[in-house]
């Protein structure tokens, strides 16, 4: 049972997230041979003020 964790900055539409789940599931199914019913995709959306690169929060850019 593959479990795929995806972390993204917030701001994508529900349709984009739905497409992401479909495409990730397909890629895992194709590359691992896992049955798609056994593939779990977990999406975590992060607030821009909770994510920083090089000491600068994304919300401050």
Curated annotation (Swiss-Prot):
One of its GO terms (molecular function) is isomerase activity. InterPro entries: 4-OT, 4-OT-like_dom, Tautomerase/MIF_sf. It is an enzyme of class 5 (isomerase). The active site is at residue 2. Its EC number is 5.3.2.-. Belongs to the 4-oxalocrotonate tautomerase family. This is Probable tautomerase SERP0934.
């Amino acid at each position: 049972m593959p479990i795929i964790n995806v972390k993204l900055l917030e701001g994508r539409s529900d349709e984009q997230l739905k497409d992401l789940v479909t495409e990730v599931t397909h890629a895992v199914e194709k590359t691992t041979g896992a049955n798609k019913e056994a593939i779990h995709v977990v999406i975590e959306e992060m607030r821009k003020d909770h994510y920083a690169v090089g000491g600068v929060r994304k919300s401050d850019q």
